[in-house]
Each structure stands twice: as structure tokens, then as C-alpha cells.
Amino acid sequence: MECDLMETDILESLEDLGYKGPLLEDGALSQAVSAGASSPEFTKLCAWLVSELRVLCKLEENVQATNSPSEAEEFQLEVSGLLGEMNCPYLSLTSGDVTKRLLIQKNCLLLLTYLISELEAARMLCVNAPPKKAQEGGGSEVFQELEGICIALGMSKPPANITMFQFFSGIEKKLKETLAKVPPNHVGKPLLKKPMGPAHWEKIEAINQAIANEYEVRRKLLIKRLDVTVQSFGWSDRAKSQTEKLAKVYQPKRSVLSPKSTISVAHLLAARQDLSKILRTSSGSIGEKTACAINKVLMGRVPDRGGRPNEIEPPPPEMPPWQKRQDGPQQQTGGRGGGRGGYEHSSYGGRGGHEQGGGRGGRGGYDHGGRGGGRGNKHQGGWTDGGSGGGGGYQDGGYRDSGFQPGGYHGGHSSGGYQGGGYGGFQTSSSYTGSGYQGGGYQQDNRYQDGGHHGDRGGGRGGRGGRGGRGGRAGQGGGWGGRGSQNYHQGGQFEQHFQHGGYQYNHSGFGQGRHYTS
């Protein structure tokens, strides 16, 4: 399957390259690559591709087509040398036994693919980068320089068969004749007198190139400043009507300015000693000779535009400075905690904690007489055989109007947590008769719980405050009001979550049968 795809691509590429051979016929290419180097048609195709490459690339190696299978080894040797010169990246074509590489069908297809791709790339490069045309005036740069010397010295055109030694000897002779006609100090002595070798000239050329690059940057800066300045002249309303005149005058002068430096090593050889003289432009003798009217013009006072680095204010920071996070207002976590979850003397309902006098404590806060589920006087047991407070489900002892009833709303107005019969729970000794933050202390008036000392093994924390009795760990909320520490609300999760919600829920749902707490 892979070989079939490669054959299809090769046939399409050969048509694009202008191949007109017999291998374009159906099945001919497949038969040729199967025989490999033993097939004369295969070798002719390879030879055609290489000949096309040699037209565009400078290749020393060449490949000749074969006439019989006996010439296969010689053909493979020629292909191996060609691939080595072209730095072929395919190891299957450059490694292994040379006489057996092109006897494999896949390797033959790979060779054709490589030669075709190289030929396509060479043709594209030739189209995109045409050969440079000869400069106007004919000849190379060196020829033009020599021609300029001959013209400057008044020499006639040298014959075509002259050698370089004869040509330069003629130039030297003509120079001596010309110098003899001028005063002795007309040209001056050269500034560079020491003989230079090839290594010295290379260093001088490198130095000149570095300086040329530096001055090219400076020239570009000055030219850009010139362009911007001239452009600003045309911003005024008066100058907008003169734009064409300004361009007509400026553009010819601007086109002459080139950022490239024209200084070369030849200028160093032509330099004379007069260039080494340093003249002080401020000296009196020089000033007298160069004086003009502009020197007498004094510049008036101009405003200080600043720009000194030591006077510039630092920029604002990218990021604002880090500040310590301010704590929010402290919330009243316990506060009034007014629940009935403590030691209750009356029968105001809400069986949280250990009720002593609330035998028939009523169904919730407002019901004095109802059974409300639970035996009011059971100490240390808290088991409720009244189901969910006698009322079941949303009974008054569980759900119990707990918006503001004693035993419903936590924190500010509620009694203890899930108390108040909380689902049939006659909590005799709830370790934490109240939500996570409500008070469970000793309650005298059935309305306000102080968070102090619980009278009878109940208590828990009163509003994050006082330690409530021995009833288990202070932080463990009074779930089913067991024996203090054994409850199902570790840390009062539900109490904290619903302490401002208006309703109190039992952990186990809405009133489930009997609840036993040891």
C-alpha cells in the first residue's frame, strides 16, 4: 500500500517536471522499480533526473544509464558517490552493501523521491533568485576600478591579450610620469608606511567593518531626524499648500543621502600625513580666518526643558504595594444564646438538656400541656419513646414553630440547638444543648441562657463562652443529646449551618421513631 502511494506521487511529480519517458505508462514504473538497478529504464530515469540537477547545481558526480543488467553494480557505485556529495539523509540509501541497495523496490522508490524533490527545490530557487545582471557600464567591480584608473591617468585601452603583470606595470610607469610633472610635496607622504601582510589586512578590514556598522546606525538616526523635521514643516495650514514645492526641492537632496558608508581600506592607503594634523578651531589664528557674521549672533535665554536623569521622578510601580488583609468585624457567635437547653425549672417546652420540672413539657415552646414526645423526667437517658415528639414529622416538638420559639432559632432567640424536643428527643443530658454557638448554661427563667455553668451535666459552650459543665466536649453540639460526648454532630455542623435559619433540624431527618442516647 505504501509503495503504491509512492508510485502515484512519483508519476505526478515526473509529469510536472516535464518527463516524457516510457515509465509514465500504466504499470511501467512499478515493473522498473521492482527490478531496481537491473532495469535499464530505471537507470535512464535516474540519469535524466541527475542531468537536470547538474544544470542547476554544481555537482561533480554523474550517473550514466545502463544498457544491460550486468552494469547494475557500476550504476550503484555512481549513485552512491552522487548521494554522498548531495548529503542524502536516508540511511537505507547510504549505508549497507553498495551492490544490493538498489535491488529493493522500496529503496528504488525512495531514491526517485529524493532526486525529484531535490530537482523541484533547485528549480524553485532558480526562479526565485535569478542570476544577477551585469552592472551598467559592463564588467565587474574590479574591472570598473581599473578602468577608472586608466581614464584618470589618460591611458589608452589595453589590448585583450595583455597579462595582469604587464597591465599593472603600465599603470606604475604612467604614475611615475605623472608625478614627475607636479611639485615634490604635491601628493605628500603616505600616512601608513609599514608593510602589511595578509593577516594584517584581514584585521584592518574587520576594524573598518565594525566602524562602518557603527556609523551606519548614526547615519540612519540623522536621516530619520531630518525626515521628521522636514515633515513637521508641512503641518501648518500655510505650508500645506506648498507640499508639492517642498517635495520637489527636498527629495532630490534626500535621495543622495545614503546610510551606507563609502569608506574602505583603499582610503587608508590613500591617506596622507596632512590628515594627522589636528587644528584647534578655537585658536585665535584659526578663528580670524574662519570668522563670519554668524559668530556674532548671541543666543537668548531659553527655558529649561529638563530631561536630566537625576531630576526625573521614578515611574509608578506596576503592582500596588502589598498590604496586610484587614480583619472583618467580629460576629457575635454566642451572644444571648437564649435557649431552653439548660436545667429548666418550668414546663416551657423544649426538652433540651436535662429537664427536671418539665414532665409534660409541652409540644414546643408555646405548648404547655402537650406530651410533646418524651418522658420529661428521665435523667441521663434521654430516650424518647414519643417518636418525634408525639407529633411526628413536622411535629411541634421537632420542627416546632422554630422560627422564634424557644428551641428553634439559634443564637439570638433560640434555645438549645436541636432541643425543645427536637424530633422526639427528650434530651436528658445533651452535652451541648444548643447549636455550636448557643448557650447551654444554667437557665433560671427559661428565656435567657447565660452560657455559664450548666446545672446538670449538660452545657457545652455558651456562646463560645463559658465552659458548660461536664457534658462532653464543649465543642460537640447536642445532636441527639446523648451522654455528652457521644453525639452525631461533631463540632455542631448542623447547628452552625442552621443557627440563623429559623428552623432546627434533627440530624436524622424529620422525626424518626425512637431515639436512644446512652
From Swiss-Prot:
Domain of life: Eukaryota
Start-end of Gly residues biased regions: 349-364, 383-396, 405-415, 460-484
GO cellular component: tRNA-splicing ligase complex
Annotated stretches, region: Disordered: 300-415, 434-518
Record-level GO BP terms: lysosome localization; positive regulation of cell population proliferation; positive regulation of gene expression; positive regulation of ruffle assembly; protein methylation
Pfam families listed in its UniProt record: DUF2465 (PF10239)
Assembly notes: Interacts (via N- and C-terminus) with DDX1. Interacts (via N- and C-terminus) with C14orf166. Interacts with FAM98B. Interacts with PLEKHM1 (via N- and C-terminus).
Reported function: Positively stimulates PRMT1-induced protein arginine methylation. Involved in skeletal homeostasis. Positively regulates lysosome peripheral distribution and ruffled border formation in osteoclasts.
PANTHER family found in the cross-reference section: FAM98, PROTEIN FAM98A
Family indicated by similarity: Belongs to the FAM98 family.
Protein name per UniProt: Protein FAM98A
Species whose genome carries this gene: Pongo abelii (Sumatran orangutan)
Lineage of the species this protein comes from: Eukaryota, Metazoa, Chordata, Craniata, Vertebrata
